[in-house]
Amino acid sequence: MGKRRTQSLIDSNSSDSDSESETNLESDLMSLAKKRKKPQTAAKSSSRSDSDSDWANNKAGAPSSKKKKRQKPSRDSSSSESNWDDDSQDERQPARQSPAQTQQEHKPPEQASQPAQLSEQEEGEVSDSDSDKSKSNSSSSGSDSSSSSSSSDSEFDDGFDDDLMGDDEDRRRLNGLSEKERETEIYKRIEQREIMRTRWEIERKLKLARRGEKNQEKSKNKGERAKKKKEKREKKARKAREAQAPLPTQASTSTLLDVEPKPSNEVRSASPLSTPALNRDAASTSAAVASIMPDDAASSAGVSDYFDHKERSKERKKNVEANKTDDKRSNAMALLKAKREGKAKREEEEAKRMAEKDRDDDKEELDSVSGCKSAVKLKASEIYSDDSGSSDWDEEEKPAGKRSRSNSSKASSESEDEEKAPQRPVFITTREDLNKLRLSRYKMERFVNLPIFESTVLNCFVRISIGNNGQKPVYRVAEIVGVVETGKIYSLGTTRTNRGLRLKHGTQERVFRLEFISNQEFTENEFNKWNEVCQQSHVQMPTIDLIAIKQNDIKKALNYEFKDEDVDKIVEEKNRFRNRPTNYAMKKTCLMKERDAAMLRGDYDIAQDLGQQIDELENRASELDKRRSHTLNLISYINDRNRKKNVEDAEKAILEEARANKGLKISDPFTRRITQPRMGFKGAKKDEDDMQLAPLPPPPPGKKRPNEAGTSSASVRSTDSKDYSLYSLHDFDIDLDVPLPVNTNSVPKPASKPAETVSKRSLNLEDYKKKRGLI
């Protein structure tokens, strides 16, 4: 049913549009083939001819079994040519009644004319138009497939929508999850989408690149195929002329022009699109024969009866196979011949160039000899050269011109040699010039950690200490010839290093540490000593040019910009030469972490080594702590001793004071006293003045005056202050005679206690001395 539907569709299309081209028919066939996938297992298992017949079968709508049955004799033709001819004649009658005949009857005039043209093509030939049609068909199918693939590749699809959800089942599953699980799943899908999108973009770019390469290859192959077709046509025409040349003209005309017309309704096993190539071949062969054969119709008719159709088909088949093999052989031979010719040409050119070079060298040698410039003899190779097509006069003029050119080139080369001749080196002869190459210890401290330290200090000079002569140090001028590492780590300024310099003094070389380099300049005696040693040892002195070079190196080292790698290297080197870590606690913590990690990994040896390092670090830290706290302990001991001594001295002073006072209370003017404020009035002061102005009554007999009594009372008071016994306290005299005032009329007012206006605490120095009895 499928085959009938296809045939009916083709017939309807052909009947509706008679002017439709063959390309539209092919596009319709391709669309039908895409809509209905037809199994092609039989076509895949068949040979190359079967695949071509299947394509023709799909186009004609005939069953593939009949095609296979019709093409079977053509496959057996390689074994026996006679059987192939008989079978082909026997199969012509069934082929005429095939469905292709009925289809051809309904085709437009353009398609119906094709079987008539097919009759002119002989069996066994493959036309160019057939291959072109098949290629166009494959290219159209390829373009369709590429367009479909490009359309599929133009959009990225991972099976989820914009909300990162799939079908309804996936939505229900996500809705059934908790919010946290849903967000986690969506986040995973986002990451997966990014990965897949990146991979898809990379694959798309690769596909586009492959398509571009394929298109370039196709365009190149098309050009090559067109070129090969052109060459084949030319070779066929040439071979046809060569093949027809030895034969009689009548025979050649009969073989080429005696073509029996075949019925138009016959469908050949080859493609019906091969007629244009046959027409082109026939035209070329007829044109080639037209120049050879005479225009005689009777002779051509007589020769045509001599050849049979079978003989002619066999000969044509042999010619086709011979053309194929000859093309390959001729191409291979042409390539091999071209390679050999190119190689021979290159060898010949190389030989010519070497010969010319030898001739020029010989001429220069002859010209350099005095008196031989006019007597230059030419070699036989120069006169009888194979590549010289000029006359004898040219050959005679050529050496003269060459001699003149060689002379001029020699003169120019001599002038250039004089200009390029190296100037005589100027050596250092003064101490000032040598001091420009000197490096001090301060600069060594700055350069020792630089990556360019060795290249900077090489060929420089230093003032090195070699020992003492009595109590005076001895220095020598030495040249730096190398940088080495010594076995001792020493301090150089603020850094520690183990580098040393290999120094040269005359012919002697020794290694010195950087700490022995002097900062002072060379003295005159040291310079003279070094100069004398160099002359005796035949050592070349440094040149003036070396000064500029080394000064540039030193300047570059002073302005060197450190990189991250340089800083890491310097830090590592300083840590290697440091006696102890900068932070014991951090170092111990790092070692403990490494030890725990090694224990978890099972590396017990490494853990044991790390434990030993931790113990050593703790021991070193404890030693440093003792050394640091030793001075602190001495100071604290001295402070404690002084404190105890002060306490003892204070106690002794207290005891002595107590022993001196003997329990007496001594008023100290500098101690605080309890005081009470009192109000003072002027009236009381006037009363005191009046009492002082009043005359005192005479003392009773046996009594002293008040002044005397005051002195005596003061003395008693002083003695009483010293003696506090009851007897002394009650041992005092009472004066019963009271003196009366002079003015009897005045009634004395009640005496009020005089107010002390001055505080007891306010004592001047004189009162204090009086109170102490110092005055």
Curated annotation (Swiss-Prot):
Modification Phosphotyrosine occurs at: 384
UniProt note: phenotype after gene disruption: Death at pupal stage. Weaker mutants that live to adulthood exhibit reduced wing width.
Assembly with partners or alone: Interacts with the RNA polymerase II complex. May interact with the PAF1 complex.
UniProt key word Electron transport: no
Coiled-coil stretches: 604-665
Cellular component GO terms held in the UniProt record: Cdc73/Paf1 complex; chromatin; euchromatin; nucleus
Record-listed Phosphoserine modification sites: 49, 51, 53, 269, 271, 385, 388, 390-391, 412-413, 415
Biased composition (Basic residues): 225-239
Protein name: RNA polymerase-associated protein Rtf1
Keyword annotations from UniProtKB, A to Z: Activator, Chromosome, Coiled coil, Notch signaling pathway, Nucleus, Phosphoprotein, Transcription, Transcription regulation
Domain of life: Eukaryota
Span list, region Disordered: 1-370, 385-427, 673-720, 738-775
GO BP term, pick one: positive regulation of transcription by RNA polymerase II
Lineage start: Eukaryota, Metazoa, Ecdysozoa, Arthropoda, Hexapoda
PROSITE patterns, alphabetized: PLUS3
